[in-house]
Amino acid sequence: IGMDRWKETYCMVVALCAYVMIRANHKPPVSVLPRPEMAHMSNVGIGHILLEESVRVRQSYDHRENPTHYSVLTLWFYSGCYFVLARENTAWTYLRDATTQAQLLGMHDEETYKHDPLDISRKRVLYWLLFIAERYSYKPTCSLQRSLLTAYRTYALRKHRPISLHPTIHSPSLDEVPSDRPIAVGLELMINMFRIIDDTFINLWNRVHSTHASAAWITQVQTQLSGAVPAYFECTEVQEVQIRITQQWLRSQAWQLSACQGLVSSVSNDIPLTFKYPIEIARDLLTISHQFSQQAMEVHGVGLVSRFPFFAPSALILEIVFV
């Protein structure tokens, strides 16, 4: 193995360790820490040191000219680390680097996967996670598939930023590993929801063109979002809460888009185009809060309130969810 390839693998593993430490809720054994003084540091402090180490080593070799899936994964972990450290612009920059390198590798082209039979499903997972991240970015955990279980942050929608990846390849298949089945189902549902947030939606949201959305198109989007998640599916409780809250959040974003487009009216025959529609979404959120355990809901914490700013007062949502 070449020195650059060794460094690349090292950077990926250390970046993964950095993110696990930043997110961890328990102290690692002192015996595994690289320096004795780290035993007195916080998890975030240890993770920050590991992150800086990975970034430092990565700067010592040419990682741009010949990218690999390891380099894309490393950038993905960097993005997650810097977001947790409240450096969102740096996190976005690394996410952009990851999507660019993914395109250089042809991960957006279905033909690429026909010539590389090894670990295809995992590479597809990585592409689709990047696809979702641009639209509704989230913090990755040590397992790519399990990153669906964590708290989310928005980029293309909340930050009005452009997207570069599109739904141009088949969805991943993880059926060959029975333990991955619930995760695969959840990922498939997330992919299907974010397919609806297409170029037309993002361009209207970002006001790229002077064109306006039609009432029929908005109604179609709301119909697709409302039917995107079945009444029952196999997954963990926390994952199901995340998926169902994401669905309601996307419905709220579509309603805000229709309001900005001047399509909302108190006399509209289409319920998604009325002022009462946010109340319907709020009721669905209330139902979700009653269906699942407090522990599963608390995973989302204050982020749940920040995702639905037009449901006033915010204290009411906190009362609904946590009381």
Regions of interest found by a model, annotated:
Residues M12-V13, C17, Y70-S71, L75, ...:
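TPR repeat positional signature
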Residues I1-V72, F77-R87, S179-R181, Y232-V241, ...:
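C-terminal transcriptional activation/regulatory domains of eukaryotic transcription factors
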Residues G45-P67, D97-E110, S173-V177, N192-D199, ...:
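Long, amphipathic alpha-helical regulatory blocks in the mid-to-C-terminal portion
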Residues E8, M12, Y70, L118-R122, ...:
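Structural signature of alpha-solenoid helical repeat junctions
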Residues N25, Q103-P230, Q261:
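Fungal transcription factor middle regulatory core
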Residues L85-Q101:
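Classical protein tyrosine phosphatase
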